[in-house]
UniProtKB/Swiss-Prot annotation:
Descriptive protein name: Putative ankyrin repeat protein L289
Superkingdom of this protein's organism: Viruses
Keywords from the UniProt entry: ANK repeat, Repeat
Entry keyword annotation includes Repeat: yes
Membrane-crossing segments per the record: none
UniProt cross-references to Pfam families, sorted A to Z: Ank_2
ANK repeat locations: 31-71, 72-105, 110-143, 147-181, 185-218, 222-255, 259-297, 300-339, 340-374, 378-413, 414-447
InterPro entries: Ankyrin_rpt, Ankyrin_rpt-contain_sf, Multifunctional_regulatory
Length: 544
């Protein structure tokens, strides 16, 4: 049995007072405790004092208040039962029942009875002996609270309890409880356990319920079955083993809820709601292998590929999304149209997500044989939708690819082309996109846009000419800068001629005729020393 560690230390309970707040379980406190309730939570507070004897002594004079309720509607029996393995004891529970404590009183927290409270905590502060004792003294095993939850459901009503209550379930079923009883929401115990089988390590409980005639095909009020919820959460609170068990016991793999959702669509819909792990793909592959089909979903009759595209909103999961599409394309037709006439490519091009792997996914769809020229009910192709979507237009390569494979001048029901829609949303930063669209031969139908395109072409020309002029100016500036640096070098021709002029004026002929100055003399083309002096003097006149 799991060792329960108390949240409260008994020394913190303090002296009794009706208006004081005291804990009545591991996660609840309130006022209006009776003295009996206070004695129950303090039964083991002092190891040198027998707390049970104090309770016995108190009941001799105060038996008529045994069923008193505190601020939250809890009785002394509820407190003792839920804590019979911790602050209180099984013998105190038995004493209270013998003295007339009513096991069927409801508290103010969802009308819970003592049996439900003890059953939901049997692996913690309560125990199985307490359950048996309560039933023996007349606790109603078929009681349901305001939510229609019975004690059987309460074994798993806490979805995050990290323990398995199979022992309690077996006990309750041995008393004749209906294994297929439902809550007000229509949830069976199998549905509840299937949803949390990973959290509670309770795949064995799923197997036990199925072996004992739990029906896996009972839908709840939304039409969702145990297989749907297990498949949806197979990457988090449930697991693939539960999905396999349900299918082994003839769960309908293609059962549809009221929204036409199936187990397959539930997995895909939840693909990005939970942290990704390999169970996403394993569950998908398994369901497809077992015969899951692409059933039109919802009012729009969406295909499974459309659901995958629509539900994806996290750009950081783009790699996983590409893998998902690749898997689905191996088994399902990309050219299926929804009730609006759209294909999965329409939904992709209309997706309002930037930094999305549009190019990779379009390539996958094209490889799978999608027709990019299919029109929806409004006569729009995927390219027309893309030209009306800023997020898509930010991806230049995606636009280029779509223009390449599409009939670029298709006209929709309003008489507009892809270029018309692009110009309706045109911004200067999309000039490069305009160039791509025009390159593939796009033209306008709308007369206003025809004039607009002419103006834009002029602006484009001026823009390019302006860029060329700026580049020319930069080149000229660089030439001037480099020329100055070159001219003032000691070894430059300019500096040598200046030096020769100085030597000539000072009649240092021996320094004029030297190996270092031969290139300068050769440049001047002098035929003798007098001609050289003349040409040096003449040349230096023009050096600034």
């Amino acid at each position: 049995m799991t060792q329960y560690i108390s949240k409260y230390s008994p020394i913190d309970f303090g002296e009794y007072g009706y208006d004081k707040s005291f804990p009545y379980c591991y996660n609840g406190t309130c006022k209006n405790f009776s003295k009996l309730m206070w004695l129950v939570i303090n039964e083991k507070s002092n190891p040198r004092i027998d707390g049970h004897k104090k309770i016995v002594k108190h009941l001799k004079k105060n038996k008529r208040k045994i069923n008193a309720q505190n601020e939250h509607g809890w009785t002394a029996l509820m407190i003792a039962s839920i804590l019979s393995n911790d602050w209180s004891s099984i013998k105190t529970v038995k004493l209270l029942l013998k003295k007339g404590a009513d096991p069927n009183i409801e508290n103010y927290n969802y009308s819970q009875t003592v049996l439900k409270l003890a059953a939901s905590n049997v692996k913690y502060a309560s125990n199985i002996k307490t359950i048996k004792l309560l039933i023996h003294y007349g606790a109603d095993i078929n009681h349901k609270n305001l939510l229609g939850v019975s004690v059987l459901h309460y074994c798993y009503i806490d979805y995050y309890t990290k323990s398995d209550n199979l022992e309690v379930i077996k006990l309750l079923l041995s008393y004749g409880m209906d294994i297929n009883s439902v809550t007000n929401q229509g949830n069976t115990l199998l549905y509840i356990v299937s949803k949390v089988s990973q959290n509670n390590n309770s795949t064995e409980t799923v197997k036990f319920l199925l072996e004992n005639n739990a029906d896996p095909n009972i839908p709840n009020n939304k039409g969702t079955t145990a297989l749907m919820v297990a498949s949806k959460y197979s990457n988090s609170t449930s697991n693939l083993a539960t999905v396999k068990l349900l299918l082994d016991y003839e769960a309908n793999i293609n059962f549809m809820n009221k929204y036409n959702e199936t187990a397959l669509s539930k997995v895909v819909s939840n693909f990005y709601e939970s942290n990704y792990n390999k169970n996403n793909f394993m569950t998908l592959k398994f369901l497809i292998q077992k015969g899951a089909i692409d059933i039109p979903i919802g009012i729009d009759k969406l295909s499974i590929l459309m659901v995958a595209v629509i539900r994806t909103y996290c750009s950081e999961n783009s790699d996983n999304f590409t893998k998902l599409i690749e898997l689905l394309l191996k088994h399902f037709n990309p050219n299926i149209q929804c009730s609006n006439g759209k294909t999965v490519l329409h939904y992709l091009c209309n997706k309002q997500v930037c930094n999305f792997p549009y190019v990779d996914v379009i390539n996958l769809l094209l490889k799978a044989g999608i027709n990019p020229n299919i029109k929806d009910n409004q006569g729009k192709t995927a390219l027309i939708l893309a030209c009306d979507n800023y997020c898509f237009l930010k991806n230049k390569e995606a636009v280029r690819l779509l223009c390449k494979v599409s009939t670029i001048n298709t006209i929709d029901n309003t008489g507009q082309s892809a270029l018309d829609y692009f110009l309706n949303k045109y911004k200067e930063k999309y000039t490069n996109i305009l160039t791509i669209i025009l390159k593939y031969g796009a033209y306008c139908v709308n007369k206003n846009n025809i004039n607009k395109i002419k103006i834009l072409k002029c602006f484009d020309y001026l823009n390019k000419n302006n860029k060329i002029n700026k580049i020319h100016e930069k080149i000229c500036d660089q030439i001037k800068l480099k020329a100055i640096k070159h001219q003032i070098r000691p070894t430059s021709l300019r500096m040598k001629i200046i030096s020769l002029n100085w030597y000539s004026r000072s009649y240092q002929t021996d320094k004029i005729i030297s190996w270092n100055n031969l290139d300068a003399i050769d440049y001047l083309g002098a035929i003798d020393i007098d001609d050289l002096r003349y040409k040096i003097s003449d040349c230096t006149k023009y050096i600034d």
